[in-house]
Amino acid sequence: MSDTISKHDLMSVCTVSRETIDRLEVYAGLLEKWNSTINLVSKNTINQMWKRHFLDSAQLWPHIPSETKTLVDIGSGAGFAGLVLAIIGMEKSPNMKFTLIESDSRKCAFMRNVSREINLDVQIITKRIEEVTDIKADVITARALATVSQLLEYSKNILKDNGVCLFLKGNACCDELKIAKESWVFLSSQSQSITHATGCVLRLTEIKYAS
């Protein structure tokens, strides 16, 4: 899949306008520029960034409940998936509040630079996830961050009681779910990733500690 095709796929997956793609192209240009001096993403993925990073992140959008008011992306890195979702949200859900949590100050500086360039209103917190306790999210997202068990630990202090977790996972997802169920009770569903043959979008709801 070429990057050109991936741009069209992104427009189709999220039914976004050319204006949103233009904002993402500004993001892509800054990513390429910054990545030459700061390791934001693997240099091997830059030539396929629209598929490997932008489309991969954007595929979460259709899974976000329409009534969502607050979305928190944990371990945002260079903005995948949270910054991509926030850019889509500018068009699709302008009243939704996005918060991105990332402990690396350089990556946060990059995300703030992107946000300024495209006039994106997003909260970026430079802290470890477990240090953030003063926000509550309807939806928590994460991409390539940790095991399901660890993601639930990260989420427990910031997810609302009726909240939803959306995680991009790889081929170890089923094994991770079995381990997570030793400590947690939840409902889960998986949707095939559109960017990785062995990947999925994992949706968790009704999350509680196992008694």
Predicted region positions:
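Conserved beta-strand signature within the Rossmann-like core of class I S-adenosyl-L-methionine
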Residues: 162-172
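A short helix->loop->beta-strand "cap" motif at the edges of active sites that frequently abuts
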Residues: 95-96, 161-163
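Short glycine-rich anion-binding loops that position phosphate/pyrophosphate groups of nucleotides
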Residues: 77, 145-147, 171-173
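Conserved SAM/SAH cofactor-binding pocket of Class I
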Residues: 58-142
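Active-site capping/gating segments
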Residues: 172-211
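Short conserved AdoMet
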Residues: 65-66, 160, 181
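Class I SAM-dependent transferase core
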Residues: 1-68, 72, 105-118
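A short glycine-rich, Lys/Arg-flanked "PGG" loop and its adjoining helix->strand segment in the class I
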Residues: 152-162
